Amino acid sequence: MYADGKLIYQLDAVPGIWGNTPGWTWNIVRFSSNVSSLQVQFTPCYPETAGQQKTFYIGGGYNIYRGVMRRAMPAFLISMMVILIGLYISIYWIVIRCGSRIDGTLLYLGIFSILLGTWSANETDVATLLLTNRQGCSYLAFATLMLLPMSCILFVKSFLEIRDDWFCRIICNANLALIVLTHILNATEIYEFRRSLWMTHALIILMILYLLVVICSKIARRQLDQ
């Protein structure tokens, strides 16, 4: 950022284990009210991030901070509730599992809730403002998103008593292979997490299509409880 042609702020992408990115972060820059012109220059870390919309706030730092936190807090609290519900369900399954033989439906639901809540909470502005390790948070977002398809499909398969093991196993194995592959590509700096995100999205779409077909099939066969 330049104020009247003078450089006053700069944020560089530092290569690390999380990737060549500063992470999704807020940049707070203080400058004099006497400044007549400001120039902001962006250099995308990856081609995929070029052209993304940027939001600017001008005013007192405290008022901006309070306004952003107030708007983002409801979504953050809902995400935290989802995490707590997932933890409760998982612990409950572990406790009752010791005394009786039950399937893993509740455990899969608990894990899925924890992953979904963690991912959604990490995407809010509350997490962006409070958590300082933005590279680590960026990795957390990718990791939880990559784990979501497998946990979701295991829950639905167990809950609906889906007997199709073949295609379900293919999706789960593809999910595991994707996790290993993307971590190797990121570690070797061949293809970092941000650039391989489309693979995770493709797997999620495949999972959704599979679940829709299975649910519609069970409805058509009147095997789904009303």
PLM features: what roles do these ranges have?
Residues 1-82:
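Membrane-proximal, cysteine-centered motifs at transmembrane boundaries in secretory-pathway
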Residues 73-226:
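Juxtamembrane segments at transmembrane-helix boundaries
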